[in-house]
């Protein structure tokens, strides 16, 4: 029986969103702008990388071709050197947003057809009733932040005061999120998780997609750093997803990285959550080696987004792309006859763009495996086509999306 491996390169958009201007993202192009920056020497960092962006294996699967169709231009150095080895195309998100949850749910066949709630870019940002309830139920002396902020900047700004006062740092962004940062030792990791559970319930009436625990360590003297113990508290998907259909059919499923959090741990199978892209890919390949017939390994590689996109770090993002590309032969070697591997993204996060938020972009769709027919699959009018294709490959059906098989 067939098997499938889906790898989401978190935030690796390819530009060309037809409605990008409505989000302030007209012209945003994560992959294209990274490639251009590297070609111009702006992607160099001593000891990390230098020169043009080199992604020969992804280019050979049609990544550059997909980017050209989406954005209208070929990213420098990403033209394939010979026949393309997989099916390639690009997809337009139908959900009205550019957040992780919407992107992943749509990939899994449950497009978001409503508007998420968001907090305004004011100070304070949160409704007073929400703040009062969180302080009371969480037994807190108060909160810090209460604003739109970058995750790294906010702990630099409030970390020392947090340690002195015991007040957690609460902040948001243009996405539908309520984030709580607290020191792992001084505040306590389990206490932070419990507080986020309270916040999850309190945020439900506001239709907030995720409450995110953002633990950090360090001191004012040595500096503060976020740890790997992030946890997302998402609201459940609004309808059946590919994961639900797999569970109903009794199929094996392994969720790697933050997939479990994104789907509110509903029918997410065996969850594995290592830290870092390489560790997540190691876990995905190990799980796939043992995966039974008709099963799925669903992996998210988040470092592209959290470590490099939000931080607007072009050299770091480029190096991470090159590292993933170098492991593609390993991924292809893991595929048996009847297996399908699909590489895609959930949104963009252009590190050359203004601000620190996600960018509205199309995403690449690259599908390959023994016996898979190579060639263009065109523009997909919704990320749900990805889930529909995986479902069809596994002999299942989804209510949304159209398979290209």
From Swiss-Prot:
Family matches, as CDD domains: PPM
Biological process terms in GO annotation: 2-deoxyribose 1-phosphate catabolic process; 5-phosphoribose 1-diphosphate biosynthetic process; metabolic compound salvage; nucleotide metabolic process
Residues that coordinate or bind Mn(2+) 1: 10, 346-347
Major enzyme class: isomerase
Metabolic or biological pathway, per its Swiss-Prot or TrEMBL entry: Carbohydrate degradation; 2-deoxy-D-ribose 1-phosphate degradation; D-glyceraldehyde 3-phosphate and acetaldehyde from 2-deoxy-alpha-D-ribose 1-phosphate: step 1/2
InterPro entries, alphabetized: Alkaline_phosphatase_core_sf, DeoB, Metalloenzyme, Phosphopentomutase_DeoB_cap_sf
Cofactor note: Binds 2 manganese ions.
Keyword Acetylation in record: no
EC number: 5.4.2.7
Cofactor names: Mn(2+)
Protein's UniProt keywords contain Kinase: no
Reaction catalyzed: 2-deoxy-alpha-D-ribose 1-phosphate = 2-deoxy-D-ribose 5-phosphate; alpha-D-ribose 1-phosphate = D-ribose 5-phosphate
Any one GO cellular component localisation term in the record: cytosol
Keyword annotations from UniProtKB, A to Z: Cytoplasm, Isomerase, Manganese, Metal-binding
Compartments reported by the entry: Cytoplasm
PANTHER family recorded: PHOSPHOPENTOMUTASE
Function: Isomerase that catalyzes the conversion of deoxy-ribose 1-phosphate (dRib-1-P) and ribose 1-phosphate (Rib-1-P) to deoxy-ribose 5-phosphate (dRib-5-P) and ribose 5-phosphate (Rib-5-P), respectively.
Family: Belongs to the phosphopentomutase family.
Protein name: Phosphopentomutase
């Amino acid at each position: 029986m067939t098997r499938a491996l889906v790898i989401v390169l978190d935030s690796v958009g390819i530009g060309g969103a037809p409605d990008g201007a409505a989000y302030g993202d007209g012209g945003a192009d994560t992959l294209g702008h990274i490639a251009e920056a590297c070609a111009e020497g702006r992607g160099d960092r001593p000891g990390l990388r230098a020169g043009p962006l080199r992604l020969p294996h992804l280019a050979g699967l049609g990544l550059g071709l997909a980017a050209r169709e989406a954005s209208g231009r070929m990213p420098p150095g990403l033209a394939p050197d010979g026949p393309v080895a997989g099916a390639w195309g690009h997809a337009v998100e139908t959900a009205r947003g550019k957040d992780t949850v919407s992107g992943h749910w749509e990939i899994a066949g449950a497009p978001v057809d409503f508007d998420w709630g968001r907090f305004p870019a004011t100070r304070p940002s949160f409704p007073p009733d929400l703040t009062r309830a969180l302080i009371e139920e969480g037994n807190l002396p108060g909160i810090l932040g209460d604003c739109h902020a970058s995750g790294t900047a906010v702990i630099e700004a409030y970390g020392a005061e947090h340690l002195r006062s015991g007040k957690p740092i609460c902040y948001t962004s243009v996405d539908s999120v309520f984030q709580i940062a607290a020191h792992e030792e001084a505040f306590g990791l389990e206490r932070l998780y419990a507080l986020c559970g309270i916040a999850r319930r309190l945020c439900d009436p506001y239709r907030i997609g995720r409450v995110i625990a953002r633990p950090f360590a360090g001191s004012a003297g040595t500096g503060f750093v976020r740890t790997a113990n992030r946890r997302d508290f998402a609201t459940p998907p609004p309808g059946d997803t590919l994961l639900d259909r797999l569970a109903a059919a009794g199929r094996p499923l392994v969720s790697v990285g933050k997939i479990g959090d994104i789907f509110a741990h509903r029918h997410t199978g065996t969850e594995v959550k290592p830290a870092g892209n390489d560790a997540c890919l190691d876990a995905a390949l190990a799980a796939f080696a043992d995966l039974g017939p008709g099963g799925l390994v669903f992996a998210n590689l988040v470092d592209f987004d959290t470590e490099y996109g939000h931080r607007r770090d072009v050299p770091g993002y480029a190096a991470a792309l090159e590292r993933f590309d170098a492991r593609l032969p390993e991924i292809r070697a893991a595929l048996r006859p009847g297996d399908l591997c699909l590489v895609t993204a959930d949104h963009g996060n252009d590190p050359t763009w203004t601000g620190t938020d996600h960018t509205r972009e199309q995403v690449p769709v690259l599908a390959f495996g023994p016996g898979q027919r190579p060639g263009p699959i065109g523009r997909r009018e919704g990320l749900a086509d990805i889930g529909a294709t995986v479902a069809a490959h596994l002999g299942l059906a989804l209510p949304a999306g159209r398979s290209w098989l």
